[in-house]
Amino acid sequence: MSLQIEALSPIMWTIIIAVALVLIAAVVFTWKSSAMSTRKMVTIAMLTAVYVVLNFAGTVRLGWINISVASLPVIVGAMLYGPVGGLLVGLLGAFMGQLLTYGVTATTILWILPQAARGLLVGVYAKHCGYKFSSGQLTLALIGTALVVTALNTGAMYIDSVIYNYDSYAYVFGGLVVRIISGAATAVLMVFVAPPVVNLLNRSLDTVRTAQ
């Protein structure tokens, strides 16, 4: 098994470095394409902190379905501020969660990619729609994004298992169907939860803006 890992290591490191470069490029591009006000930075920081707390709170279990509540601040950030907000909340929140739980490892960048992708994709869609969604549009966007996130998580699990010598197709792919269904269920729940949170934050920000 060690020979197999040594043979695959250059490939794995190439993937990890490529993912890191893509994330850096995405952050730089979105940052330059958006005016980052102090209020926006504070809101993104707050949502990032909420993500870390919810990530440690775990998931809501409904039988064999796991609902990930940590995705809420990422989706809210994307719906409020588009790809910049979504990407930064997902990227920073997932990085802090990984750092506090596992420290920095060879696959840290792979584990933060799914939430960064969720925020970026939902944010791009939000901007495309002028930040106004119907329930149907939001449902399709969140379910589609959930499928991408599940695929990225599965890829991260596989690469992590190979690098750390516990590779098992049963472990990585055995629960794939359950993860897909759980992701879709989480997306549907967020359709009902995220918009009221976004509206509440918008009203709060408008109040602060008026007071100034």
Sequence positions of predicted segments:
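Loop-helix junctions at membrane interfaces
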Residues: 1-212
